[in-house]
Structure formats: C-alpha cells, structure tokens
C-alpha cells in the first residue's frame, strides 16, 4: 500500500572547503562514501548519498565547496556547486564556529539571496567551542540572512544529527522514494574505491603531490575477510 505521508526530496550541502560536509554525510548514512582531507576542495564531483527512514527519503548532494575560484579547476567546481542550489528542495549551509563571517561567507550569502529555496544553517564542530561562543556565532548569522532553521551539530561525534534530520524532513515535499531503501549512494563501487585511494594519497603524500591528484583503477579483485 502506498504511504501518502512519505516525503522525499533533494538536499545539497554547501559551505567553505573543509568545514565537514563529507564528514556530515558519512555520519548521517552510517558509512564512508565521501572522502575527507585537510586539503581544500577534496570533493570534486557531485556525490549523491541516500538516507531512508519510515518518514521519508533524503537524497544528499555533496558538492565541491563554494569559494572564489583561483584557477580553471576551481572555477568548474564552483559552477557545479552553485548550479545545484536551484535544483534542490533544501539547502544545508555548513559552517564552523572557529571564524566569523568573512568574504567567503558573504559570497555564499549573495548566492543564497538569488533563490527561494529553504536554507538550514548547520553549525558544525560545536564540540570545539563553549556555549557562549556558539550563541554569539548564531546571533551573528541571524543578522545576515533569514534562515529557515539553525541547527548546531558535531558531525565527528554524531551530536544533534537526529534533530537535523527532523528539520530537513519538515521542508521536503510528499512523494515516493527515488531509490530502494537499501541504496546509500549513486556511486559505483569502483568510483568509491578510487576516491578512498585518493583520500589516502592526499593524507600520506601531502607534501609530495598537489591536491590535483586523480586515480584510475585498471583492475579490481574482491576478497572476503579483509
């Protein structure tokens, strides 16, 4: 029987490079899909991950960070991220309380003001600051933009993630699931493996190679009990 109360929709994560977008996505779905690194612009492609519950299905689009591009690769990645803003039902803007609003944040605000999509401000890494500092940070952002919701979380420690998911569901339309309940990403296994290799390369050889490294897998063998 069809569930008329079921919700489904697309949600994009935006923010400065390295604020924890990929970490948040991995936390929500409970497994590692998007790679993380301390290098800017680790995420190059638009990755879809899927969260499904009894209430609905959320398809997350983890885009490259929005910033002012310094080269052709950066320009392409920013274009992909900004184009996504008009294609989704909800925008999650991920920030961290270590810095207040600067040129990068104002650039994102300019992009958000061009549309009418609900925007949820997600303040990540709340485990790294005191409550007084967090409240001051929230107040600063409230003065800059009329957010639909403001949700503090810690993606690393999985704090307040359930509350964030409830907030997202509020703004999704009613409709059927886009994927079956066992699907967690649209990425093929080969692509996920290639990204995991790239992550390790960026971490272990950060001084030897630029962050413009790419991985090409020629063959794969599946083994049990690894």
Regions found by a protein language model. Name each.
Residues 15-16, 62, 123, 217-221:
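Flexible glycine-/small-residue-rich
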Residues 41-44, 74, 78, 85, ...:
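Amphipathic alpha-helical transducer elements in NTP-driven molecular machines
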Residues 51-57, 76-150, 221-225:
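Conserved C-terminal guanine-recognition region of P-loop GTPase G domains, centered on the G4
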